[in-house]
């Protein structure tokens, strides 16, 4: 179902949600961190979703073991490098990795700015080694409040040329976008793109707010847009992208089953929506699974899957010249 003549992208992929179970085990041993299991087989149920979680917050707790073993900046650098290696193994030509340095720093009180620098270094080395093109999106973890988000923002601004966009993720219901207006004003002043997790746990009003108040050019998940016809019209007319994550939305119980996922309707409505993974290490899936298993199960035709693949590059935070060069590079193969 993947068109090999087109670039394959993943533009909604959490770096800190893609820490390999084997790496968690190895870092736990290296830093003498107590883990819930001592073998890979017995650890996996603790760090990957085995059965669907009741809600988004429950799903997010699965990520915690991955960041609990980040006891040094070298560990952060390693997982960033491995994220690029995983992208290469998946056949991705371009990936946008998003990460929350405050979340990654929390367990061992690492310097937030140091985490940002370590991630930049690891991703840069990975791109050199594996030939994948990547850009970084900075996440503010709304769950930790406005002050913590300000600290993350300042760490990103210290490396503003290495950050492509700003995102807001975490507890959407408890911490609405209205709390973070000043943060996004600073992000736009820095010349960054804006993408916001919205319409996943909260309703369509969260998406409207992300667009109107925070300046979102893309929406992470955005499944609740299906409840507002005027919003769907607006998304299509303004070419505001929806970063769909099929399996993730089932695992968080945001959508009951793949057959009920709104991605097919979004595409039929002319919305620029694409297929992405979200937290592949925690989910136990990869981009190939999303295209070949999840998308057909969500009712997408072969042509709709191809359109979603095209949309992935169109939505990417790349210049027109960068997109053209990537298309030509893939076509030449």
Swiss-Prot record:
Substrate binds at residues 14, 16, 170, 279. The active site is at 200 (proton donor). Its EC number is 3.5.4.4. GO terms for cellular component: cytosol. GO terms for molecular function: 2'-deoxyadenosine deaminase activity; adenosine deaminase activity; zinc ion binding. It comes from Shigella boydii serotype 18 (strain CDC 3083-94 / BS512). Belongs to the metallo-dependent hydrolases superfamily. Adenosine and AMP deaminases family. Adenosine deaminase subfamily. Catalyzes the hydrolytic deamination of adenosine and 2-deoxyadenosine. It is an enzyme of class 3 (hydrolase). The keyword Nucleotide-binding does not apply. The gene is add. This is Adenosine deaminase. Binds 1 zinc ion per subunit.
């Amino acid at each position: 179902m993947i068109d090999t003549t087109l670039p394959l992208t993943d533009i909604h992929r959490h770096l800190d949600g893609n820490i390999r179970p084997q790496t968690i085990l190895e870092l736990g041993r290296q830093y003498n961190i107590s883990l819930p299991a001592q073998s890979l087989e017995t650890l996996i149920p603790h760090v990957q979703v085995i059965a669907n979680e009741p809600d988004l917050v429950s799903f997010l707790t699965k990520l915690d073991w991955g960041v609990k073993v980040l006891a040094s900046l070298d560990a952060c650098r390693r997982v960033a490098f491995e994220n690029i290696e995983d992208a290469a193994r998946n056949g991705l030509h371009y990936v946008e990795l998003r990460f929350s340095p405050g979340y990654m720093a929390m367990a061992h009180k690492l310097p937030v700015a140091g985490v940002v620098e370590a991630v930049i270094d690891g991703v840069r080395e990975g791109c050199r080694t594996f030939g994948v093109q990547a850009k970084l999106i900075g996440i503010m973890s709304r769950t930790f409040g406005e002050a913590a988000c300000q600290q993350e923002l300042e760490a990103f601004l210290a490396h503003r040329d290495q950050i492509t966009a700003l995102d807001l993720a975490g507890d959407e219901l408890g911490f609405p976008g209205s709390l973070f207006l000043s943060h996004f004003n600073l992000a736009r002043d820095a010349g960054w793109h804006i993408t916001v997790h919205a319409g996943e746990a909260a309703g369509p009003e969260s998406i409207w707010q992300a667009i109107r108040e925070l300046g979102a050019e893309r929406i992470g998940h955005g499944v609740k847009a299906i409840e507002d016809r005027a919003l769907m019209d607006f998304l299509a007319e303004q070419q505001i992208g929806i970063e769909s994550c099929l399996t993730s939305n089932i695992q968080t119980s945001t959508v009951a089953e793949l057959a009920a996922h709104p991605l097919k309707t979004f595409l039929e409505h002319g919305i620029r929506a694409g297929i992405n993974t979200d937290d592949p290490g925690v989910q136990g899936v990869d981009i190939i699974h999303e295209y070949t298993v999840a998308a057909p199960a969500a009712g997408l035709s072969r042509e709709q899957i191809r359109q979603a693949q095209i949309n992935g590059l169109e939505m990417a935070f790349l210049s027109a010249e960068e997109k053209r060069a990537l298309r030509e590079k893939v076509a030449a193969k």
